[in-house]
Amino acid sequence: MFTVGPAVAVRVRTSSTVASAEVPVRSSGFRLADNLLCAKPVHLRRPRRLSVTMAASAGGPGSWSENILTYFLRNRQITAEDGAEILWYHAANHKCQMSDALKSAAHMIEADVLLPSDGSEHGQPIMAHPPETGSDNTLQEWLAEVTKSNKGIKLDFKSLAAARASMLFLDNVKQHLQRPVWINADVLPGPNGSSKVVDAKAFLDTVTSFFPDVTFSLGWTTGWHPEKVNEGYTWPMVKEMDYICSELTQPVTFPVRAALVRQSCSQLLWLLTKSSRYSLTVWTGKDDIYPTEDLLYIRDCFNKTQVFYDILEPQNYEFKQAIGIRVTL
């Protein structure tokens, strides 16, 4: 399924005063849902918008930590420093989905990595999303095909064991992957989260021991329930995430669930002020119900260089149409 998304973090200006953010040293294919009910918009007080300019905290040309807006602008694949211009192909796991993704107009390909059901770290990592436990595609095969393209990649690791088992495969193709590479894991419990988290320190240590120059995508486990009021990302959640990331030197994007962002804007705005390395990636669960108005609210609250949108249809099309970005189906 094809989705679209934006964002990059930067120097933050509140009103006319520039706030110096401390930087420490060191679902698959384009898919249009026939009928998706939109929840009634919640009228919340709008937090003060932060004006931001892009910072050069990411890596240089061709590095895994290069700002994706910089990379795709340089390659003339987008026209502006706007996270909403970045097109995503989500869950490009099986070979047919991977093939569709490589033929598509997507800039970034997202895929999930796990170990086969035996859980052995010596097993071959495969491309699948739970509850699946098998796949016709291994990570090694996936990388062999994707390296032939110029697309950026985001790999979502479902366990620490999967990450550890994947590092050598990534290292073997590193010289052929001179483009943005995002490494993702859910490292903290979030709103309604019930899935097991990946140990943050062990995950970060594992990845940085092989690839110190990478972009991290660090998220919260979440859930969404159609018959109850869903709380957003709380202050303790965002403060703990900042604590985990504060000693990193790499760019970090925080994947946040679209249906939970509007009620969390104050907390997430605060989080982005903590470092020029931070950004958001808005994503959607396949069964989530939320109005397109929520995406427009997010667009109004955050700077367009700080937020990427890896979202499903029909909201993706409606959102892009509303902000004047053409979507190629």
Spans of model-derived segments:
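Sequence-pattern detector for short linear motifs
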Residues: 14-16, 29, 34, 43, ...
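A subset of signal/propeptide-processing and intrinsically disordered low-complexity segments
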Residues: 17, 29-30, 107, 305
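N-terminal chloroplast transit peptides
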Residues: 1-25, 29
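Intrinsically disordered, low-complexity polyampholyte segments enriched for Lys and acidic residues
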Residues: 22, 34-35, 40
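Phosphate-group recognition and catalysis centered on beta-loop-alpha active-site segments
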Residues: 2-5, 10-11, 38, 45-46, ...
